[in-house]
Swiss-Prot record:
PTM annotation: Contains an active site 4-methylidene-imidazol-5-one (MIO), which is formed autocatalytically by cyclization and dehydration of residues Ala-Ser-Gly.
GO cellular component: cytoplasm
Gene3D superfamilies according to UniProt: Fumarase/aspartase (Central domain), Fumarase/aspartase (N-terminal domain), Phenylalanine ammonia-lyase 1, domain 3
Pfam families linked: Lyase_aromatic
GO molecular-function term, one example from the UniProt record: ammonia-lyase activity
Pathway note: Phenylpropanoid metabolism; trans-cinnamate biosynthesis; trans-cinnamate from L-phenylalanine: step 1/1
Record localization: Cytoplasm
Binding-site positions, (E)-cinnamate: N264, Q352, R358, N388, K460, E488, N491
Protein name: Phenylalanine ammonia-lyase 1
Enzyme Commission code(s) on record: 4.3.1.24
Keyword Cytoplasm attributed: yes
Length: 720
């Protein structure tokens, strides 16, 4: 976050000393920007989650974080209470700038927005500063709400709370000419969970977010059109809002510059951007873990995470993404099992996994870097002084500039939205492989788990939904900031469109949450299918072995039969054949298992030579007995094994419990109560996905996600 020069001793001594040192040794702020990116992205996300949960946010003016803004914004979703506190040490600086405005007014000093008109009409002059502020708030109340407290034309209340917090933080720095009592009143509104109603649209975030912020000012001044929403969701007028929040002294009569101080800032755009980035950072880490789980259930080759590969590419986001995936896969029971599969007939299998898995660190790395850089840019913005003019008490002057231009918001939100769309594209590519039996290394088509695949289409509808989500997300990736229109009589001829871009990015976050929850449920389905596969294949293998011993070992008169040598190859067929190609009817002659088992016997018979002419040594003569016995036994054994698994008593436990990715599976299956989806059950995929989506939205998923990575030391595995 960007430090300002402490002019009136209104930050505590320790912070002030640090800020002065930085201003001397790092006058361009580049060193501070670089320092803010030290350490891993994961450590930063852990810190965000911890900050989000703290019940108290203390404002100094220059230390606010994205996580703190998101915390206050989402107060409705927090089980514990919350409170915003203002640093008392800031009072003197705030008062000094307010006094300066009143003194300059009394001396007849000409100052923008105090004695002049606004924007393109600043050539007008007045000595009635209070009336001018009143008119400012009135003409900026140009928004449209529609009907209802949360209509499609009302800014989400979370974004409004974020804007209130950020605006207080800016004004605390003492450059804006506003009374401390007004900041205390806004704080009381936040702490009482009273949220002014702001219009969703109507700002270009260029002279700040003028129109929406004017509705906060309207509530503070008691405008009759002002509305707020109380703690219970009821609609309040200004009188009721002040009473519930215990704001004493009545409505504020704005002094010169105070109206401008309230509305001329970027708080709505940067507040919403803070909410968006808190979620975006978590979603980025989540997808790193989901990509590793994808590698597990797809029997992927883990060498794509090897440190040397990524070290030679140099990009820190890529290196960290690979290291996190490597950590999840290191020691994974799935990886160990997959290694054995890859050793079987290696020349008949692809040497490499497809790009959606193999290049996932290279794809994700730049997106993480973009999101992290955007987070730092917004943290600098929410700690900036962004109104006009700035009151420099130390030099006894008002400085006219353009810090209200919200370009950092528009640019960072456009970039973040593009990064989210890229994450979504990779997620869809992985999902498409996961549900397609041509690519998913033996999982059933559509991840169907029922007994009758003709009446079970699993995740087919979910795949269509994912295509829809991904398409909308790709559309949202289009930039907002290249659609600028010259505004306000060509005075605001360039404008940032910061809030519009933040709103579109909030939409992108919601869509990526839909995709992530759908994908996570599908991955859990795949995990359970691998468990089912392992149990059923074990039964098939044992049954084939037993039937082979019973029917192929002994001849008609008790002698050892040459067919006994077929057993090893029969079991190799079972090992090689994907279970779900025959599991619904294991002895069907149209399915590959029985066809290939018969072919083994036929091949041996063809090699049996003259012995085939002897009925007692003929292998052909044994085929019928072998198949009849298998037909009588195998379907029952397979069904019995399936029933044991469904009752919670499988002979082989689920491998996922031995993996670092287990906490996410545990959340989905145990804590949220989802289950393996089959055609026989009434529950639909959407019902299960809804549970995970809700958990994602209320933060319930954060602890299990971070638990997956709790033992990571922040470095890749050494090159051996």
């Amino acid at each position: 976050m960007a430090p300002s020069i402490a002019q009136n001793g209104h930050v505590n001594g320790e912070v002030e000393e640090v800020l002065w040192k930085k201003s001397i040794h790092d006058p361009l702020n580049w060193e501070m920007a670089v320092d803010s990116l030290r350490g891993s992205h994961l450590d930063e996300v852990k810190k965000m989650v911890d900050e989000f949960r703290k019940p108290i946010v203390k404002l100094w003016g220059e230390t606010l974080t994205v996580a703190q803004v998101a915390s206050i914004a989402n107060a409705d979703n927090k089980t514990s209470g919350f409170k915003v506190e203002l640093s008392e040490s800031a009072r003197a600086g705030v008062k000094a700038s307010s006094d300066w405005v009143m003194d300059s007014m009394s001396k007849g000093t000409d100052s923008y927005g105090v004695t002049t008109g606004f924007c393109a009409t600043s050539h007008r002059r007045t000595k009635n500063g209070g009336a001018l502020q009143k008119e400012l708030i009135k003409f900026l109340n140009a928004g449209v709400f529609g009907n209802g407290t949360e209509s499609t034309h009302t800014l989400p209340h979370s974004a409004t709370r974020a804007a209130m917090l950020v605006r207080i933080n800016t004004l605390l720095q003492g450059y804006s000419g506003i009374r401390f009592e007004i900041l205390e009143a806004i704080t009381k509104l936040i702490n009482s969970n009273i949220t002014p109603c702001l219009p969703l649209r109507g700002t270009v975030t260029a002279s700040g977010d003028l129109v929406p912020l004017s509705y906060i000012a309207g509530l503070l001044t008691g405008r009759p059109n002002s509305k707020a929403v109380g703690p219970s969701g009821s609609k309040l007028d200004a009188d009721e809002a002040f009473r519930v929040a215990a704001v004493s002294g009545g409505f504020f009569e704005l002094q010169p510059k105070e109206g401008l101080a309230l509305v001329n800032g970027t708080a709505v755009g940067s507040g919403m951007a803070s909410i968006v980035l808190y979620d975006s950072n978590i979603l980025a880490v989540m997808f790193e873990v989901l990509s590793a789980i994808f590698a597990e259930v797809m029997n992927g080759k883990p060498e794509f995470t090897d440190y040397l590969t990524h070290k030679l590419k140099h990009h820190p986001g890529q290196i960290e993404a690979a290291a996190i995936m490597e950590h999840i896969l290191d020691g994974s029971s799935y990886v160990k099992a997959a290694q054995k599969l890859h050793e079987m007939d290696p020349l008949q299998k692809p040497k490499q996994d497809r790009y959606a898995l193999r290049t996932s660190p290279q794809w994700l790395g730049p997106q993480i870097e973009v999101i992290r850089a955007a987070t730092k840019m917004i943290e600098r913005e929410i700690n900036s002084v962004n109104d006009n003019p700035l009151i420099d008490v130390s030099r006894n002057k008002a400085i006219h500039g353009g810090n209200f231009q919200g370009t950092p918001i528009g640019v960072s939100m456009d970039n973040t939205r593009l990064a989210l769309a890229s994450i979504g594209k990779l997620m869809f590519a992985q999902f498409s492989e996961l549900v397609n039996d041509y690519y998913n290394n033996g999982l059933p088509s559509n991840l169907t788990a029922g007994r009758n695949p003709s009446l079970d289409y699993g995740f087919k509808g979910a795949e269509i939904a994912m295509a829809s989500y991904c398409s909308e997300l790709q559309f949202l990736a289009n930039p907002v900031t290249n659609h600028v229109q010259s505004a306000e009589q060509h005075n605001q001829d360039v404008n940032s469109l910061g809030l519009i871009s933040a709103r579109k990015t909030a939409e992108a976050v919601d869509i990526l949450k839909l995709m992530s929850s759908t994908y996570l449920v599908a991955l859990c389905q795949a995990i359970d299918l691998r468990h089912l596969e392992e149990n059923l294949k074990s039964v098939v293998k044992n049954t084939v072995s037993q039937v082979a011993k019973r029917t192929l070992t002994i001849g008609a008169i008790g002698e050892l039969h040459p067919a006994r040598f077929c057993e090893k190859e029969l079991l190799r067929v079972v090992d090689r054949e994907y279970l779900f190609t025959y599991a619904d009817d294991p002895c069907s002659s149209t399915y590959p298992l029985m066809q290939k088992l018969r072919q083994v016997l036929v091949d041996h018979a063809m090699k049996n030579g003259e012995s085939e002419k002897n009925i007692n040594s003929s292998i052909f003569q044994k085929i019928g007995a072998f198949e009849d016995e298998l037909n009588a036994v195998l379907p029952k054994e397979v069904e019995s094994a399936r029933a044991l698994l469904e009752s919670g008593n499988p002979s082989i436990p689920n491998r996922i419990t031995e993996c670092r990715s287990y906490p996410l599976y545990r959340l989905v299956r145990q804590e949220l109560g989802t289950e393996l989806l089959t055609g026989e059950k009434v529950r639909s995929p959407g019902e299960e996905i809804e549970k995970v989506f809700t958990a994602m939205c209320n933060g319930q998923i954060n602890d299990p996600l971070l638990e997956c990575l709790k033992s990571w030391n922040g470095a890749p595995l050494p090159i051996c």
